[in-house]
């Protein structure tokens, strides 16, 4: 079989790895912008393929706390980051981009996000495996974060705000 393409074909896994790397390091606002960044690396992709890749990777387009144009983000791979140098760096970045406000009650920190972003932020908090967090529950724009005793919800809210 002869190929008519001039550039070598990239495997789906390699292409998706590059997509994750790009979305982790740059604020990409559209599929066409992502396609251009991939093309700069010699990876040509159709819009349909890119759309499938983003869906398979679980990428979501979230608006920041300022309500501006959304950017694509890919959820973490599920491995905890506790004990890793700079393990909270990603959580800090997400908190600075998505945290609208923080409040507390008893042992709960109540975090407000732009609509649609709470689940993504809760997942990042869970995956950061912070020793003072028991777990999270997320709605559309609100995350309940349970503090581990003896920390209070107010102390937890303050700690999370300081990560921004």
UniProtKB/Swiss-Prot annotation:
Its main location: cytoplasm. The keyword Cytoplasm applies. One of its GO terms (biological process) is L-arginine biosynthetic process. Pathway: Amino-acid biosynthesis; L-arginine biosynthesis [regulation]. It is found in: Cytoplasm. Gene3D superfamilies: 3.30.1360.40, Winged helix-like DNA-binding domain superfamily/Winged helix DNA-binding domain (1.10.10.10). SUPFAM superfamilies: C-terminal domain of arginine repressor, Winged helix' DNA-binding domain. Keywords: Amino-acid biosynthesis, Arginine biosynthesis, Cytoplasm, DNA-binding, Repressor, Transcription, Transcription regulation. GO terms for molecular function: arginine binding; DNA binding; DNA-binding transcription factor activity. InterPro entries: Arg_repress, Arg_repress_C, Arg_repress_C_sf, Arg_repress_DNA-bd, WH-like_DNA-bd_sf, WH_DNA-bd_sf. One of its GO terms (cellular component) is cytoplasm. Belongs to the ArgR family. Regulates arginine biosynthesis genes. HAMAP family: Arg_repressor (MF_00173). This is Arginine repressor. It comes from Mycobacterium avium (strain 104). The gene is argR.
């Amino acid at each position: 079989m002869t190929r008519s393409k001039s550039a070598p074909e990239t495997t789906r896994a390699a292409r998706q790895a590059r997509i994750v790397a790009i979305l982790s390091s740059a604020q990409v606002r559209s599929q066409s912008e992502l396609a251009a960044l991939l093309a700069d690396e010699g990876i040509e992709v159709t819009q349909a393929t890119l759309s499938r890749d983003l869906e398979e990777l679980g990428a979501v387009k979230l608006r920041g706390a300022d309500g501006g144009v959304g950017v694509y983000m890919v959820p973490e791979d599920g491995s905890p980051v506790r004990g890793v140098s700079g393990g909270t760096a990603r959580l800090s970045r997400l908190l600075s981009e998505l945290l609208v406000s923080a409040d507390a009650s008893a042992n709960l920190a109540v975090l407000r996000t732009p609509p649609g972003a709470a689940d993504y932020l809760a997942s990042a908090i869970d995956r950061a495996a912070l020793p003072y967090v028991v777990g999270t529950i997320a709605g559309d724009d609100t995350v309940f974060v349970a503090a581990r005793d003896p920390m209070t919800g107010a102390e937890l809210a303050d700690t999370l705000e300081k990560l921004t």
